[in-house]
Amino acid sequence: MRCWVWLLVAIVLCQQLSVVRVLAAKKERKKGKDPHQFTEPFNVSLSNSEELHETDKLSETPDPGLPDAYTTWLGFVGRTDDGANSKKKCKGKDKKLRGLFGPPGPPGPQGPPGPPGMPGAEVTYEVLLQDFKQMLKEATERRLMSGDIPEHTSELPPIVLPVEDLSPYRRVDEGFHCRLKGQVIVDKKTLVELQNFQMPTAKGSFLRGSGLNLATGRFTASVPGIYQFSAHVHIDHSEIKSKAQLRPRDNVRVLICIESMCHRYTSLEVIAGLESNSKIFTVHVQGLLQLQVGQYTSIFVDNSAGAPITVQNGSDFMGILMGL
């Protein structure tokens, strides 16, 4: 055991002595340098002979200040902190470099299409018209509340059309189409009002409004305006042709009159002669009449011949409101 102790003491002393020698050698080198001594720069060019002579001197004179292996190891151990610091610096630089971002990459491929959506609501013409009316009403109310409408103006106000006139097709409020239900005999020199009509059973006929009275054959206007009326009256005059010779003044008149006053009010009138070779002929009358609320129109047949005539069933009477 004592031998080991003495061995450790000897090793420690040797280390201390070597350190002292190294320090002494460094001091001697510092003292041996002359501050006024001139040294040539390292890159001064020499001749070949001078270079060989200098290299021989360097090889012959060993440098007393060259450290041994132990001194080199101590110097390396003393610089371990510098290595750690350099690693820290490198780590800091790496972090800074990692903070930089490159340009964005190209867009990826398009994904698959999604599922189809729910079917939209069916929008009809009536719904669109109702929405437009509501929007127009709200805009008018906002303008009235904001006071943008001037109180006095010298110009005439613009004509404001109703919303129904803005639509491409106008609804027919008043109109009818009816036919005579049975035959009507008109005696000679007699004016008769046609009555007892009926609606056609076939598709295509129409009746709008409540102004038509089928029993009396009269149409009463519930809206003032201009109406268009037409009538197709089928007349059978076979009895006249068989009994007597026709006279030039023998004719038949078909009229559409207002309030049954064909001479006081404007009426629609057609005069047809009885010289036709056919047994039945048709008299057609058509035109426009202006009616006020409560006024009615009807068909009259005036027979000026010397024998009775017969108005056939199926004769038409039609009318429609054209405008106010």
From Swiss-Prot:
User: What's one GO-annotated cellular component?
Assistant: extracellular region
InterPro entries this protein is in? Adipolin/Erythroferrone-rel (IPR052136), C1q_dom (IPR001073), Tumour_necrosis_fac-like_dom (IPR008983)
Q: Where is the composition biased (Polar residues)?
A: 40-49
Report biased composition (Pro residues) as residue ranges. 103-118
What Gene Ontology terms for biological process does this UniProt record contain? regulation of D-glucose import
Specify whether Signal is a keyword of the entry.
yes
Q: Which GO terms describe its molecular function?
A: hormone activity
Keywords, comma-separated and alphabetical: Disulfide bond, Glycoprotein, Hormone, Secreted, Signal
Q: Where in the cell is it found?
A: Secreted
Sugar attachment sites are: N43
Composition bias of kind Basic and acidic residues appears in 50-60
List the residue ranges of the region (Disordered). Answer: 28-66, 83-121
Bias (Basic residues) ranges: 86-98
**Entries under PROSITE patterns matching the protein:** C1Q
Q: In the UniProt record, does the keyword Signal occur?
A: yes
What is the residue range of the signal peptide feature? 1-24
Instruction: Please list the residue ranges annotated as the C1q domain.
Output: 169-324
Q: According to its UniProt record, which protein family does this protein belong to?
A: Belongs to the adipolin/erythroferrone family.
What is said about its interaction partners and assembly? Answer: Homomultimer; disulfide-linked.
Q: Function of this protein? A: Insulin-sensitizing adipocyte-secreted protein (adipokine) that regulates glucose metabolism in liver and adipose tissue.
PANTHER family, A to Z: ADIPOLIN
What protein name does the entry list? Answer: Adipolin
